[in-house]
Design a protein with these regions (language model features):
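Short, compositionally biased
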Residues: 1-182, 251-263
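An exposed tryptophan-centered "aromatic clamp" motif
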Residues: 153-187, 191-251, 262
Length: 263
C-alpha cells in the first residue's frame, strides 16, 4: 500500500471514529457522508453552548426562520415586520430547542400552577432520582404522558395537569391578535432542559432583552416546574437563578411554567 493510500485509509478510519462519537452524544443525522468541516461545530455543540438565535415565523407563509443577533439587527424595520418572533432558539449540550419569550399565564393573569396528579401512577413516566434527572431530555414525550394520564381526573381538589396543560396551550402569537396562528407544539421542559436554562441564564436574558426590549421576558429568581417525575407525590422544580433542583409536592405547591418546543 502506498503512502498516499495509507493516508487515505487513516483519514477514513479517523472519520468513522468521529462519526461514531458524535452519534453517541445524540447527533443521529451525522453519517460518514457528512462533511468533516461540520464536525468542529458539532463538538462545540455537544460540550457546551453553540449559539442562540431568535426563532421567527414569516407572516406570508408561516415558514420558520432563525436570525442571530447581528442578522436581526441588520434587517430594516420593514423587513422585520415580515416576521413574528416565536421564541429564542438555543443549541447547547447536543440539544436544540426554543424557549418561549414569556411565562405561561392562567386565567386572571396568574403565573403559578399546580403540577397535579398527586398519588397517581402515570404509565410510561419513569421516576428520575438525583443522578438521572440531570440527563433527562424527554420533556415532549413526558408532557404527553402526563396529559393523557391525568385528563379528566381530580386529585385532592386539583383537576388534570395544570402545569403541563399551560405549557401546551401557550401561544407566541394568534390569528386574531397577530394575523397568524402559532402551531408550535410547546411542552413542559424536562429537568435537563431547565439545567441548560440555568447554566446559560445570563446569555439567555441578554438575548431576550436584545430581541424583545423588555425585562419582563427575563428568566428570574423563581422556581419552575419540569415534566420530570420524582415519585407519585413529587416532581422536580428548578430555580433558574440558583440552579437548585428541588422535588416539590405536585398538589401543594404552585410554581411557574416556561414552555419550550423542539427546534
Amino acid at each position: 500500500m502506498s503512502t498516499k493510500e495509507q493516508s487515505a485509509t487513516l483519514l477514513r478510519l479517523n472519520k468513522q471514529e468521529q462519526v461514531k462519537a458524535l452519534q453517541a452524544v445524540g447527533f443521529a443525522d451525522i453519517t460518514e457522508s457528512s462533511r468533516a468541516s461540520e464536525f468542529p461545530n458539532r463538538i462545540k455543540w455537544a460540550t457546551g453552548l453553540l449559539d442562540m438565535r431568535v426563532a421567527c415565523n414569516r407572516i406570508s407563509d408561516n415558514s420558520k426562520w432563525y436570525f442571530t443577533r447581528e442578522e436581526w439587527s441588520s434587517l430594516t424595520p420593514a423587513n422585520k415586520l415580515k416576521f413574528i418572533r416565536r421564541g429564542l432558539c438555543i443549541r447547547a449540550h447536543s440539544q436544540p430547542f426554543v424557549i418561549a419569550a414569556q411565562e405561561c399565564y392562567a386565567e386572571g393573569l396568574s403565573t403559578s400552577f399546580y403540577w397535579g396528579g398527586l398519588g397517581k401512577t402515570i404509565d410510561g413516566l419513569s421516576q428520575k432520582l438525583l443522578g438521572k434527572m440531570y440527563t433527562c431530555f424527554t420533556g415532549k414525550e413526558d408532557t404527553q404522558l402526563i396529559l393523557d394520564a391525568l385528563k379528566g381526573t381530580v386529585s385532592n381538589g386539583v383537576e388534570g395537569a395544570p402545569a403541563a396543560e399551560a405549557a401546551v396551550a401557550y401561544k407566541a402569537f394568534t390569528l386574531d391578535g397577530d394575523g397568524l396562528e402559532d402551531t408550535t407544539e410547546w411542552f413542559l421542559p424536562s429537568s435537563g432542559h431547565m439545567m441548560i436554562l440555568y447554566r446559560y441564564r445570563d446569555q439567555i436574558n441578554e438575548m431576550l432583552r436584545a430581541f424583545w426590549s423588555s425585562d419582563s421576558m427575563l428568566l428570574t429568581d423563581k422556581y419552575y416546574w419540569t415534566s420530570t417525575n420524582y415519585d407519585t407525590t413529587n416532581a422536580w422544580t428548578c430555580n433558574v437563578n440558583t440552579g437548585h433542583m428541588v422535588v416539590q409536592n405536585k398538589n401543594t405547591n404552585m410554581f411557574h411554567v416556561r414552555a419550550i418546543a423542539e427546534d
